[in-house]
């Protein structure tokens, strides 16, 4: 009997990337149209922010994008009690009819930073080269930084912008156990279980928005510039359980020059869960997971042939199905 202990560090994910997307021409809809649609049903008298009232603290509203867009001048309503909204980017034409401004283009810039790092403490035991057992305890550290800037340009210099900031930090733990059995000299059978990673996470988020608008008022051209922001100390603590995984494998040595291996993995995406910090279930999110995800199956088959003592050729195929459930027609 022999045994060993090991420690390892792995960077599982690097989030660093920057990208820009832009579009031009006559676009049909604006971000302001989308925000106006989202705000439908909310009394406009409750969306406005002043020194005596903070709509972000109003539990009955619950949609910060609508609040931010309203205070940034994206949309208007007919009166303070009205619950229907329209994009502010337009004006009455010569016939008195409402005419939207031409949306000439939009641009999105995104910057992402962060990583997922894992620290493993592993233990293994070998029993007479017939049975090999292993176990690993892992601690995972996650940090993610997201910044985005979105701009739209209308005719006559009218414009809007939306900036988003998100910081996510979390720590998780997991364990893996496995065994390899050699019932015969030419055959190896293996099984392993990778537990979920249980994360404790914190999201910190902040948004800024603004607009510049020109319009006619009693025959006189006027302009309006508005800027708004969400509270800068907003955060959300939660817990997340990632999918667990089973692995089954077999390998056969054929003579002295060939090897065939088969691996099967079962990834249980349907077991993902979100929780509040008090341990209660995030009912709506978890129901979405149950409704939309299932287990994913992966099969890998490979073969290796040793052409010379120093050179071998290996080939293989793999198949995975989708973890997304098919929508019923």
Regions found by a protein language model. Name each.
Residues 2-329:
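Outer-membrane beta-barrel porins/channels
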């Amino acid at each position: 009997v022999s045994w060993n202990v090991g420690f390892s560090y792995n960077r599982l994910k690097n989030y660093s990337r920057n990208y820009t997307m832009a579009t031009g021409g006559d676009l049909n809809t604006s971000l302001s149209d989308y925000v106006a649609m989202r705000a439908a049903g909310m009394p406009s008298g409750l969306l406005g922010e002043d020194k005596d009232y903070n709509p972000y603290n109003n539990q009955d509203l619950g949609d910060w994008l609508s609040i931010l867009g309203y205070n940034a001048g994206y949309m208007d309503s007919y009166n303070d009690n009205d619950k229907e909204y329209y994009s502010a980017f337009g004006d009455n034409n010569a016939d008195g009819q409402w005419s939207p401004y031409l949306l000439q283009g939009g641009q999105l810039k995104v910057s992402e930073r962060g990583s997922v790092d894992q620290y493993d403490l592993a233990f293994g035991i070998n029993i007479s080269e017939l049975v090999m057992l292993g176990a690993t305890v892992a601690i995972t550290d996650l940090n993610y930084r997201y910044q985005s800037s979105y701009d739209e340009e209308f005719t006559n210099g009218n414009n809007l912008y939306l900036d988003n900031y998100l910081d996510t930090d979390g720590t998780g733990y997991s364990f893996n156990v496995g065994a390899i059995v050699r019932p015969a000299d030419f055959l190896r059978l293996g099984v392993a279980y990778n537990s979920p990673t249980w994360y404790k996470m914190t999201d910190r988020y902040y948004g800024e928005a603004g607009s510049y608008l020109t319009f006619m008022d009693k025959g006189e051209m006027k302009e309006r510039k508005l800027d708004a922001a969400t509270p800068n100390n907003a955060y959300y603590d939660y817990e997340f359980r990632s999918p667990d995984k089973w692995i089954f494998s077999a390998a056969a040595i054929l003579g002295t020059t060939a090897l065939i291996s088969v691996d099967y993995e079962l990834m249980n995406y349907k077991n993902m869960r979100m929780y509040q910090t008090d341990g209660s279930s995030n009912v709506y999110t978890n129901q979405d997971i149950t409704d939309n995800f299932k287990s994913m199956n992966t099969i890998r088959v490979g073969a290796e042939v040793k052409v010379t003592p120093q050179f071998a050729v290996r080939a293989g195929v793999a198949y995975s199905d989708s973890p997304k459930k098919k929508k019923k027609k």
